Amino acid sequence: LDNAIQVNTDACAEGFPAMSILPSDEILAQFGVRLITALGGRLNPHWLVESQREKWVLRRWYQSAESIDYELRLVARLAALGWPVAPVVEGPVELAGHYWSLAPFLPGDPPSAAAPHAEQRARGRLLAQFHADLSRIEGFGQREGWRRCEAVLTDPALDQTLTMHEQTRSEEVRILRWHLERARRRIVGLKLQARPGMIIHGDFTPWNLRFTSGRLVGVLDFELAHWDHRVGDFALSWRGKYDEVIHGYAEVSPLEPEEWELITPLWWANLIENACRDMRNGTCDDGWTIKKLLQRSVLMGQDAVGFG
């Protein structure tokens, strides 16, 4: 056990960082803060801390230094454009093999879930406005560990992984292969490599937004931000079911016909790549990926047909 964290319970079986870890006294002293409570985070754990009666967020990064720098530069650019984000004020500093940083605490609450369709449509409109500024940001290539769906779907390693696990996970592999083949057929003729790209947020979900009295006061969690097709931001904001997000987006920024065609295979490529990575790493997701692959929406067009 390194001296930067104290572990209260075992890490989860799926291979993600344990959420019960606490920053050590050494870490708290480094930033001159007092621990208040854990804030969560699937990959990058966060804690609410206090210094001189001000609240801050302490973060332990799981990414490489290169990926961290990518995110820090992006958030700083967005702050300069007037978006309510939380640029790092101290760090990152490396202690015992981990990077740590301190950022402002953004108050507010996630959008109300009382009227889900209205929330989704409003979030779609907000995403289009966010993209208008994201598209102005230049000087960013691809983030380490990411690639666009055309590279994913043409990767023979996917087929090799599925073949390797066909005997032990036959039904899961059958579902993955069926969707992989349909996604590949769907992108034929779209000339994706020639299409423009932009930086996307990657997880524009209600829990990553904060509002006060109906006013946006926080956009959180850029750990999945990367360079992609702009409709790549529909993957985790739409998830194959929240159609109003896409309709709201299109109200502000209409989609091209090719982009409508791309939404489904891009979403499936994301799921299939993650599933194959889990297979290679021997981790599991309790069936979440397969459940999402089997989700259907009228926006899928020809791919709204059921698996079979």
Where are these regions (language model features)?
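ATP-binding pocket architecture of kinase catalytic cores
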Residues: S51-F140
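Active-site Asp-x-Gly
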Residues: I199, R210-W260
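ATP/Mg2+ or Mg2+-diphosphate-binding catalytic cores
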Residues: A11, V152-L153, D159-T168, N274-G308
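A cross-family kinase active-site recognition segment
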Residues: A114-R174, G197
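A short helix-loop-beta-strand connector motif used in the catalytic cores of GNAT acetyltransferases and
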Residues: L43-W47, F130, K191-G197
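Conserved hydrophobic/aromatic beta-strand scaffold that supports enzyme active sites
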Residues: H46-L48, V57, W100-L102, I199, ...
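Conserved NTP-binding catalytic cores of kinases and kinase-like/nucleotidyltransferase enzymes
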Residues: D2-P92, R215, F307-G308
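Conserved catalytic-loop position in the HRD/HxD motif
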Residues: D203
